[in-house]
Amino acid sequence: MSAVSPFKLPRKTPFGFGEKVIEKVSGLSKLDAIYEKYAFSDDSFEFANEVLVQLNTRYEIERGSIGDIPKKGPLVVVANHPLGGLEGVILAALIGKVRQDVKVLANEMLSRIPQLARLFIGVDVFETKSSRSTNTRAVKEAHRHLSEGGVLIVFPAGEVSSWQSGQNQITDKDWSKSIGGFVRRSQAQVLPLFIDGVNSRLFYQAGRVHPLLRTLLLPRELINKSGKTITVSLGDVIEAKELNKLDNDKCIADYLRLNTYLLNSSRNGDSTSINGDENRNYYATPVMDAVDKALLAKEVEELNDDDLLLSQGDLEVYCVSSNRIPNSLMEIGRVRELCFRAVGEGSGNASDTDEYDRSYLQLFVWQKQKHDIVGAYRLGITKELIQQSGIEGLYSRSLFNYDSAFLNSMDDSIEVGRSVVAPAYQRQLQPLLLLWKGIAHFVAKNPKYTHLFGPVSISNDYSPVARQLIASVMTVTHYDNEKAKLVQPTTPLAPSNNTFWQSDMLSSLGDVGLFSKVLSRLEKGPGIPILLKQYLGLNGKLVCFNVDPAFNDALDGLIVVNLAQVDKRTLGKYMGKENAQRYIQRHQH
């Protein structure tokens, strides 16, 4: 036991009166009583566990398990900082169950406790004359520890969570970019952890008066957690090579913070897929039976050679007006409804066909041996549709409010949508590729068309918070702000209480691969929707988001692709090298 308690202030006032008052108000005196009463172990990890017992505070793992913690090699553990001191003890106890080579970079006040001195690397959070040298030594020690293959626990905010007026919530302030330096230099794995905790109202009110008052009350916040259970969520380990794709240390800090806070969103009510039992009545009407294959084959056989866009093995790609293939259109509608229901969308009808199908072209992939509709797309020639039915003849106009100004911004355009691949062929890459090749070959035959546009769906298989995140990231990184001024949603996406992120935190997610990893971790499965990814690969830009009540509240993004600005190599992948060369030369200005 230390001769001088770490919870007693140096006596500078007469009889120590002032210090005693501060100790009582702040809660230091109660911590001192606990510290003096019990014979704590000198072992740092045992001490951490004993402190939790004496404070009558528990922690439980709500997501992940200690088995997810890498057992060797340099590891940086990043966490939010909601409580101010207790989380350091909790994480030391938690990580200590798996690794003994642990250091915690935290407030130096904790490192003054003898039993924690060997475990904590103290940082001076006050801007004093000595803080620069103290913190420089701390950073060097942290780097050295990682270079030796150890675990470093860091709270990158550097101070306890507080009211952030810009975000209108209690949360961490911006994370220090120094966390990026630790990761980049050590090439360590990173384990994000989210700690679900909150301090008293008095604590936050005091902080709004002056940060020092908040600091003064931190010991009291340790004590008032008695009888409470703090939940901890462990994320998936993030490899250094993933973080190496980010531009700088600030981007790394933002990326890690996003992945950490998403652990909270992933376990609350906003995380569940919309596609659930509540939608069973929506699908009360069964999907129609498959159309007789003989009828389909007869229709395809009667098509002209000019209707065939391309063929590959037993697969052929056609594009024809709907009135020429009534049976095939019924089968396409059946396949649409079957597939869209599987991801929480669908019209709820026996077949997904509508009044727009009659005036649109149907592009489809045909399996000539099995007589199957493999996949399909719907194409609308914008000017022709407007001539026939006005602007309301465009399907996208039922979802988004726009006028001729938006359409004129795209020159000659084709509205595309209702993309689908039949269930039996969804594990193959070829069908979707052939659909895109079909569109490209159609454009090559009709090279005046420069733009594709239409709704791309984010299905209800994605949780609400994932849908919000997709919309937010796309708005920051893949958005045409000028065209967006010309479009309004008919049913806007409602804001969520879980949109903790700010736009600058999302700016590094323009890399589709990185963002897909974030989504995959959040959803424990799918990354970016495959069709959206395809559009982005063609430099597609979103201009608006809308919820479609007639399609089981699917979230649609209105996307625009300028084919004339797609690079020749990418365009050649779909259109063919020579076709792409001619097309690009035609549209060069």
What is the meaning of each model-derived region?
Residues 99-106, 360, 366-392:
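Carboxylate/His-rich catalytic cores and anion/metal-binding grooves
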Residues 281-323:
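Conserved N-terminal entry element of GNAT/NAT acetyltransferase domains
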Residues 103-134, 139, 146:
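Conserved nucleotide-cofactor-binding alpha/beta core module
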Residues 62, 72, 76-78, 84-91, ...:
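Short acidic (Asp/Glu) patches
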Residues 309-366, 372-375:
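Short amphipathic alpha-helix that is part of the acyltransferase structural core
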Residues 2, 136-288, 501-509:
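Non-catalytic C-terminal accessory region of glycerolipid acyltransferases
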Residues 1-81, 88-90, 97-101, 117-118, ...:
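Membrane-anchoring hydrophobic helices of lipid-metabolizing enzymes
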Residues 337, 347-350, 384-541, 546-556, ...:
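Acyl-donor binding region in acyl/amide transferases
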